[in-house]
Amino acid sequence: MLKSTLEAFSDTNGKARAAAINGTVELTNLIPPTVTYESRGDLLIVGAQEHITALADQFSELHSVTLLATDATEAKAGFSNLYFSQDVSAKGYLGAFEVTCQVAGQLTKANLAKVAIGRDCFDLILDMTENGIMSLEIPAPGYYAVGSRKDKLAQLVEDLPAMMGTFDKPKYFRLNPDLCAHSSRGVEGCDRCLDACPAGALSSDGVEIAIDPYLCQGVGTCATACPTEAITYALPDPQNTQNFVHRVITRYKQEGGEKPTLLFYGNRDEKAVTQALATLPSSVIAIALEELATVGVDTWFSALVYGAHQVLLATNTKYIPATIDRVLSNELAMAQRFLTEMGYDADRICLFDFSDVETYVPYQEALVTPVSEALTGSKREKLFTSLEMLYTEASTKPEQSSVAEKAPYGSVSCDTKDCTLCMSCVAVCPTRALHAIGDRPGLLFIEEDCVQCGMCEKACPEKVISLEPRFNWDWQARKEAKLVHEEPAACCISCGKAFAPASMVKMLTEKLQGHSHFQGDAIRRISMCEDCRVRDIFEQMEKDPASQARV
């Protein structure tokens, strides 16, 4: 349908668009990793007794049907598979639903599957309760929340018997813990991805982020929210998406097309997009994504420097979950803030409502001279490169811009008079934005690498570091290693080796002079390097063996 709509245009732009979309292959993983579900067909129906007992016989093709009534009426005769509980909790996915409740004859909560069918779990859940026993914005595979919408039952009666067997789906993400800024050495940091998943697939044990591939629905908001690319979308990966965008625009122009506008949309909106393209100008090029939120500011701005005059984001507010809407809105607000700070119109990147098809007017001019090659590097590097190009040709050139509180851009400030250069901040920094000078006591900072995770602020024992959310438009200042603090080194009083910041040695001497282990000449060891300190301890033991008991 989409192809025929594109080919219906006979003008130059229309022909160029059809050639670009039909003739550009998106390189992706043709055999992606998969996740496998196993279902024996054990169904649990939850809801009011009157409703669930009326349905039981309609699922006779399934392996088993268990009924769980949530009202307090008396049991109907003839239903040995009927249980009662008003306190029900459930977790899991297709083939592995664990339902816990307190049923008659049990003093405590029990696994209902073990009680009812002798298994650890149910395979499917049909939920007819008003509020649902699982509260995820995007239901887990195998969980069907009907509530009071009885019109859905007929289709489920037909569909559920087919949910027995083995089912595969793609594994939509890649997770690299080495890049994650969530925690380090017991200090908690970035948590942007945790509240970005509407499917409940992400969790944290306080040390690492985990993604349950069985709950993941491929929405991509976690990857968009992740500032370090510890989480990346895999179908396709962001670089392939951007390369595809670049090739489409390049092919469009090679075929004679002019003034391209990109319209990103999720696959489920293909019908609405096809209808819209029949009316929109033929210079509007539609780019399909698995989900709209799988790409963010780096892809949007890359499209502008590839030659797109405008980037439109097709959204359907009738079904978009609140979490996706929030992540997308935050990302869009940041993009539009960058644009307006440079004097560009905010709607060069904007949401597109299908009801505006008739009144849409495209931009006639590009913002910059398009780049000839697709951008490479991390998503931050591609974003910064795009912004630098736009900044160069901007009418307004700000030095710094404020950003939202949790935006992954900014600096750190340090109250240097109380800094001891203990390097606790360096030890936890996940991106090496903060790092030591190396050959002498000192602390350096690279603003472009800072994702504002906050671990340095929490790890500092002297509480002298604080975050400064902002965007620095001076690309040289943003990239260079800036000196935060430096001081003379303390030299070992025994061998002369520089071994620690002088202020730290002074501070430790003052704090430990009353300690039992540092009485008399022992206090001198604080002013020694590690080798001389050990040597001095053993020399003292040799002279006074009884001193071993005091070390």
Where are these regions (language model features)?
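Short hydrophobic beta-strand motif reused across regulatory alpha/beta modules
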Residues: L202-S203, C222, I231-T232, L434-H435, ...
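Short linker/helix segments within small regulatory modules
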Residues: G206-A210, D439-L444, K482-E486, K506-I526
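Glycine-rich phosphate/pyrophosphate-binding loops
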Residues: Y306-P321
